[in-house]
Amino acid sequence: MITLKTIKKKYNIEQKNTKLSIGIDFGTTYSLVASALEDNIYIILDQNNRALLPSIINYTSKKPIVGWEAQKQAINDPKNTIISIKRLIGHSYDEINKLYPNLPYHLTYDKNGILSFIVQDNLINTINVSSEIFKTLKNRVNTIFNQKILGAVITVPAHFNDLQRQEIKKSAELANLNIIRLLNEPTSAAIAYGLHLNKNKIVAIYDLGGGTFDISILKLNQGIFEVLATSGNTNLGGDDFDQLLVNYIQKKTHFSYSKLDFIFQRKLLYLAKSIKIKLTSHNSVQFQFNNSKMHTITRFEFEKMIEPLILKTLNICQHVLHDSNTNLTHIEEIILVGGSTNIPIVQRKVSDFFKQLPLCTINPEQVVVAGAAIQANMLTNGSKYNNFILLDVVPLSLGIEVIGNIVEKIILKNTPLPISKTKTFTTFKDKQTTMLIHVLQGEHKLVNKCQSLCRFVLKEIPKKPAGKIIVLVNFQIDVNGLLSVTAEIKSTKIRKNITVNASIPIKKYRN
């Protein structure tokens, strides 16, 4: 079994030719950083012995305040204190308003079409906001080690789409980090556990965090980590449990959330968060809000409240078992990941579903960053952790729009990475000289039910009758799950390339 250690003091790397690499778990609620060095995995602490960094950024001062100090401002300055940024990245303004209608922020777009916040009369996009978390974690590392960070592995939800992955990558690069791999969170947890799971086996990784849910089925076979299938929901997590508690408190105290100002809304949210945490270890909790009378909520009430959301995750688990061509009898280990798996009913329901007790010998809040640190060390140094091969998969199908508002799939979900695939298309009208390539991600057949990633135009098509000109469309996805698209006129070799990235305006093309 791997051993996790913590470190907060200056550390000199003694092994010769050892390059410093780090793993970062960029979370909805908290973020962490770790490094695998000299046969140990170190969770890097701040000066106050804290491993967790709240993923919160406050913009009241000239310089952004990040983490615990920002959390102190979250209630009294909600408009300028951004929480759960991970849930907002890669989304359009309309999507955010639909998903989270009561946010206190003043949202707009920057000149590149990226969702942005107006704070203290400044325009700050989601990439810049996220980068402050990476900068803070990087500074934490720099205060400990005597070497430059040569590479970082950053974990992302397995079900993140291409725009979200690109935005995280750009945020980390803005913090001057060299990104050597984007690693899916469940796969990262499997790496942390898999190093001591010597037998060949099939494992399930159930990852329920603050903002997202992932489930992955992996086959471990003589040092090969093969992801058989993955699925999830990027808008389901502990934050949703908080919102259910907010609704409960409103009913008990007769306060209408929508009629409260933003400060009281944030106070109510943080009261809900504290109740949730206390109910993890207590059978009941007393509370009051804004001088209301004292009320009591029991764990039983809370569990009934959140049970439908937990059942949603188990329904996704059922689908991923089907996608992986496995059944419950094949699953030999179920691994819990994410802070929300500390909730007793989550553990019980997962155990009942998989018909076995979950494995949680590594702290669920630290296992992902541990795996990322191991992967980073392997990619930069080799070391004792170089005896495994990682085979991940495409989380969502990718294709292009064709006539009839239909998506023609080019790469299907759960295809092993990396992958390059080409499909043939033809012109659909006489003397057609251009072709619009609209790239989409998702499982639905209809365009408006899928995620629009980008559009570009292939020009200089020879004027021929409909169907006579052949266009080859190639999709290439690298090990990070990042997409490049090429469209080529077969007869003339004229081509157009594009790498889908977060700087492509999304406000115009979201469906």
Swiss-Prot record:
PROSITE patterns to which the protein is assigned, alphabetical: HSP70_2, HSP70_3
NCBIfam families in the cross-refs: PRK05183.1 (NF003520)
Keywords per UniProt: ATP-binding, Chaperone, Nucleotide-binding
Originating organism: Buchnera aphidicola subsp. Baizongia pistaciae (strain Bp)
SUPFAM superfamilies recorded: Actin-like ATPase domain, Heat shock protein 70kD (HSP70), peptide-binding domain
Similarity annotation: Belongs to the heat shock protein 70 family.
Gene of this entry: hscA
Pfam families in the cross-refs: HSP70 (PF00012)
Function: Chaperone involved in the maturation of iron-sulfur cluster-containing proteins. Has a low intrinsic ATPase activity which is markedly stimulated by HscB. Involved in the maturation of IscU.
GO molecular function, one term: ATP-dependent protein folding chaperone
Protein name, entry field: Chaperone protein HscA
